[in-house]
C-alpha cells in the first residue's frame, strides 16, 4: 500500500492488490483507503485481516511481529486481477507476501500475465521478515523481476544463502545484476547512503541528515519515487536523487503515508 500511495502522489494511476477479512479490521482498512483516495483491488476472504505488531528500537528502526494464516496469505487470482495485469506498466512485489502458496501463485500469475512492453518495470523489493522466505521463492523472484531493491543487511543474508563470493557489497551487487540480467539493482545502506547499479554504471547518493520521527515506509517511498521518475523518463541519477529526498522527508514524518510537499511532487514535471 505504501508504494502504491506514493506512486499515486506523482500522478500515476496505481492499485493496491491484496486481501482483507470479513471483519472490523477489514472495514477499517477499506475506510483508510477511501480517506487516502487510494485505489485498490482488495478481495474479502474468509481469513482474518492481517496484523503486524510494530515496535521501534532506540534508533527509531521498526521491528515486526507478523501474524500468520491471514487474508493476505490467500489472495485469489480473479478475472479483474487478470485484466489489471494486462494493462500494468510497473509492479512492485515482495518476498513476504509469497510465504503462503496461494498468494505466491497469484503473484507469479500476475507477473506472467503482464504483456512485454518497452520500459516495463517488475520490481522485486525484498522484505526478509522473521523466517518467511526460502531460497526457492527468492530465486524465482530474481528470475521474474527486472529491478531488484535490497538493503545491505538483506544482501549479506542473500549472499550467504546463494554462496556469492567476495567481501565487498558492490561486488555482490554486480554478481546479482549479471546473473539475473537485471535492468537495475537498488542497494540501500541506511545512513551510509544508497546505490543504483545498471549494466556498466553505478550511481551513489549520500543519505541526508534529517530529524527522524520514524523510518516506517521510508524504503517504500524511496522505491516509489525512483520508479515514478524512471517511468517519466528521468535519468538514473535524477531518479536516484529524488528517491533519496522523498525517503528523507518520509523519515521526518510519523506514519508511512504522509502527504509529500508540493515541491517534491512537482519535481517530475520539471
Question: Residue ranges of each PLM-predicted region?
Answer:
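Residues that scaffold the ATP/ADP-binding catalytic core of kinase and kinase-like folds
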Residues: 65, 158-159, 250
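Structural alpha-helical scaffold elements that stabilize or flank donor/cofactor-binding regions
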Residues: 83-84, 140-141, 178
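Conserved phosphate-binding/catalytic region of the ribokinase-like
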Residues: 162, 166-270
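Conserved N-terminal subdomain of the carbohydrate kinase-like
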Residues: 13-95, 112, 116, 266-270
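Conserved beta-alpha-beta core of the PfkB/ribokinase-like small-molecule kinase fold
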Residues: 90, 94-171, 193
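Alpha-helix C-terminal capping segments
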Residues: 2-13, 56, 229-233
Amino acid at each position: 500500500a505504501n508504494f502504491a500511495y506514493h506512486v499515486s502522489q506523482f500522478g500515476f494511476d496505481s492499485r493496491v492488490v491484496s486481501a482483507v477479512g470479513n471483519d472490523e479490521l477489514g472495514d477499517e482498512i477499506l475506510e483508510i483507503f477511501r480517506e487516502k483516495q487510494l485505489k485498490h483491488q482488495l478481495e474479502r476472504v474468509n481469513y482474518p485481516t492481517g496484523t503486524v505488531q510494530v515496535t521501534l528500537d532506540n534508533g527509531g528502526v521498526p521491528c515486526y511481529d507478523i501474524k500468520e494464516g491471514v487474508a493476505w496469505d490467500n489472495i485469489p487470482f480473479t478475472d479483474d486481477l487478470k485484466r489489471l495485469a494486462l494493462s500494468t506498466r510497473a509492479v512492485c512485489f515482495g518476498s513476504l507476501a509469497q510465504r503462503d502458496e496461494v498468494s505466491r501463485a497469484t503473484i507469479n500469475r500476475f507477473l506472467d500475465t503482464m504483456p512485454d512492453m518497452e520500459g516495463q518495470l517488475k520490481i522485486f523489493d525484498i522484505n526478509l521478515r522473521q523466517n518467511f522466505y526460502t531460497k526457492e521463492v527468492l530465486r524465482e523472484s530474481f528470475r521474474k523481476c527486472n529491478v531488484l531493491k535490497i538493503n545491505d543487511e538483506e544482501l549479506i543474508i542473500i549472499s550467504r544463502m546463494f554462496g556469492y563470493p567476495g567481501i565487498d557489497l558492490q561486488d555482490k551487487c554486480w554478481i546479482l545484476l549479471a546473473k539475473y540480467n537485471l535492468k537495475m539493482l537498488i542497494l540501500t545502506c541506511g545512513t551510509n547512503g544508497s546505490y543504483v547499479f545498471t549494466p556498466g554504471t553505478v550511481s551513489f547518493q549520500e543519505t541526508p541528515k534529517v530529524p527522524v520521527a520514524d523510518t516506517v515506509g521510508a524504503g517504500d517511498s524511496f522505491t516509489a519515487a525512483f520508479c515514478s521518475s524512471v517511468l517519466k523518463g528521468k535519468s538514473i541519477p535524477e531518479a536516484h536523487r529524488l528517491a533519496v529526498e522523498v525517503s528523507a522527508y518520509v523519515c521526518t514524518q510519523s506514519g508511512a503515508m504522509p502527504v509529500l510537499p508540493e515541491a517534491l511532487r512537482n519535481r517530475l514535471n520539471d
